């Protein structure tokens, strides 16, 4: 009889424990990360016209316009500054997992790290590139939370050994309904919070080369957690999934845009 009562109590307890207390298996979390990556990846090329607004405490707001080019199958990325005039022709090129910056005023290329502030803003290379979460991070379950009107999974991502990223730890909020990323909080190795990023709007575009929709954040809001009061707004104004010229991802091509 005591055994029956114990079994009954265990059954009742399992029914009243909230679903949020049930941790996700690592395989399920990896699958979620792969889905995020796959939905943002295009089998062909990718081009976007991007508006960037940089706000710094006690300084005037600065607005940039850049063109972003991607060839996801070959891990290639180019960021070309179009406006303002003083920045036009400046650019970044990622080849073989190395990031280079070109300054047309001196005609020189310099290698940059993943911590590079793109154009001096709060953005990083990864904010414009394809998502590689499953490839670069190992997930751990941190629970379920309400984020505004959204029900979200919260995961803690730690960088895998030997992988070069801007920040080694990311706290990630993933919309349970849509699978879209809602929020990132990025930490230094010391545990210090460095950036908070929100993704309030997502969009999608059908890709002929992929045969599926490609998802992209329509808007990104980045807040500097070290220099309080500094923030960056990124808006994807136009996305094109048609093929790009074969030689576009070269230093010579980018240099030609400043002549």
Model-derived segments and spans:
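Gly/Pro-enriched, hydrophobic low-complexity segments
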Residues: 132, 150-251
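N-terminal, post-signal-peptide region of Sec/Tat-exported proteins
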Residues: 44-78
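Bacterial N-terminal signal peptides
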Residues: 7-18
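Positively charged n-region of N-terminal signal peptides that target proteins for export
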Residues: 1-5
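Short amphipathic beta-strand and strand-loop transition segments with alternating hydrophobic
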Residues: 68-69, 140-146, 200-207
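Flexible, processing/modification-adjacent segments and terminal tails
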Residues: 24-45, 51-52, 60-62, 85-86, ...
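N-terminal post-signal-peptidase region of extra-cytosolic proteins
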Residues: 79-85
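Signal peptide processing junction and immediate N-terminal pro/mature segment
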Residues: 19-23
């Amino acid at each position: 009889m005591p055994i029956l009562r114990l079994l009954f109590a265990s059954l009742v307890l399992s029914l009243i424990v909230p679903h949020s207390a049930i941790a996700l298996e690592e395989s399920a979390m990896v699958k979620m990360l792969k889905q995020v990556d796959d939905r943002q990846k295009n089998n062909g090329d990718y081009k976007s016209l991007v508006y960037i607004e940089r706000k710094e405490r006690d300084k005037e707001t600065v607005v940039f316009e850049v063109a972003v080019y991607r060839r996801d199958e070959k891990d290639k990325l180019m960021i070309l500054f179009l406006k303002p005039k003083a920045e036009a022709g400046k650019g970044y090129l990622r080849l073989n997992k190395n990031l280079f910056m070109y300054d047309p005023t001196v005609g020189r290329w310099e290698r940059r790290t993943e911590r590079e502030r793109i154009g001096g803003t709060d953005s990083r290379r990864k904010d414009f590139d394809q998502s590689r979460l499953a490839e670069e991070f190992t997930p751990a379950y941190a629970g379920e939370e309400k984020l505004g009107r959204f029900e979200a999974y919260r995961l803690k991502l730690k960088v895998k050994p030997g992988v070069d990223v801007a920040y080694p730890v990311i706290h990630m909020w993933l919309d349970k309904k849509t699978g879209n990323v809602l929020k990132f909080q990025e930490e230094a190795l010391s545990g210090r919070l460095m950036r908070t990023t929100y993704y309030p709007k997502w969009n999608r575009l059908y890709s002929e080369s992929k045969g599926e929709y490609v998802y992209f954040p329509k808007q990104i809001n980045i807040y500097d957690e070290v220099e309080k009061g500094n923030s960056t707004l990124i808006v994807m104004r136009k996305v094109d999934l048609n093929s790009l010229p074969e030689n576009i991802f070269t230093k010579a091509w980018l240099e030609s845009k400043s002549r």
